[in-house]
């Protein structure tokens, strides 16, 4: 089974630790990493990429000192290796204009406002990771016990049906 990376980026250590704690259940099947800056996030992505580990999902704060989360997500969307990545914005400070920019230019997949509920965050991450593996992994059967079983089996059935046509 392919290993994929979930990366959380937030410049506030308490927030980052809280998000990582909420995502701990994913650690059995994904590599879950945190970064306190865009530069640190880029380093993690590069190091994991050198090991053949793809970035499946990034959960990024918007307001950070060196670069906004939206600008970083736009940058990721411009590279072939990270374009398929599911991109989530976790913030309490993005205005309407920033959010529209993220949707239009960064292919934002989901917006989560702070404060968040742990169960809702995990459900959202599960759905986004399901979307990612359906689109990017050929061995879907491996994921049926981990992610959204019904959607994965439906996708497998649809692929078999379209292959036979």
Locations of regions flagged by a protein language model:
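Two-component/phosphorelay signaling modules centered on CheY-like receiver
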Residues: 4, 13-37, 80
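Active-site residues of response regulator receiver
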Residues: 10, 61, 91
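Active-site beta3 strand of CheY-like receiver
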Residues: 49-59
């Amino acid at each position: 089974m392919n290993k994929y990376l979930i990366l959380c980026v937030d410049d506030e250590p308490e927030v980052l630790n809280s998000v990582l704690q909420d995502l701990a259940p994913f650690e059995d099947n994904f590599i879950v990493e945190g970064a306190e800056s865009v530069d640190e996030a880029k380093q993690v992505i590069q190091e994991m990429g050198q090991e053949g580990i793809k970035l499946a999902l990034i959960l990024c704060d918007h307001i950070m000192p060196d670069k906004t989360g939206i600008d970083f997500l736009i940058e990721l969307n411009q590279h072939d290796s990270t374009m398929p990545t599911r991109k989530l914005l976790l913030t309490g400070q993005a205005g309407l204009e920033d959010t529209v920019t993220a949707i239009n230019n960064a292919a934002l997949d989901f917006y989560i406002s702070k404060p968040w509920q742990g169960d809702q965050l995990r459900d959202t991450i599960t759905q986004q990771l399901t979307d990612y593996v359906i689109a990017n992994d050929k061995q879907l059967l491996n994921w049926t016990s981990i992610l959204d079983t019904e959607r994965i089996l439906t996708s497998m059935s649809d692929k078999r049906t379209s292959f036979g046509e």
